[in-house]
Amino acid sequence: MHVIEVLGPSCADCLKLELAAAHAVKEAGIEAEVRKVTDARRIRQYGVTSTPGLVIDGVVASTGRVPSAAEITDWLRGN
């Protein structure tokens, strides 16, 4: 099962990313848990300085923007 973490405070773009990630999981037809991470210390541990950030299975996939659900689906499928 994949673990997807959405990094950032409770902002509009963070919510958009969380929804896009959930849609991507459904679209990809995979098992994944989408987690919201708001703790600044934890976010810095990933080296993310611009939010929202997206981490898939411990690897930073995106920072400072909201990738589309299609992009996230591709990343989840390994494309």
Describe the predicted segments one by one:
Residues 1-25:
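Local sequence-structure signature of Cys/Sec-based thiol-disulfide redox active-site neighborhoods
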Residues 30-40:
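Thiol-based oxidoreductase modules, predominantly thioredoxin-like and allied folds used
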Residues 47-55:
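Structural micro-motif
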Residues 59-79:
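Non-catalytic, surface beta->alpha helical segment in thiol-disulfide oxidoreductase systems
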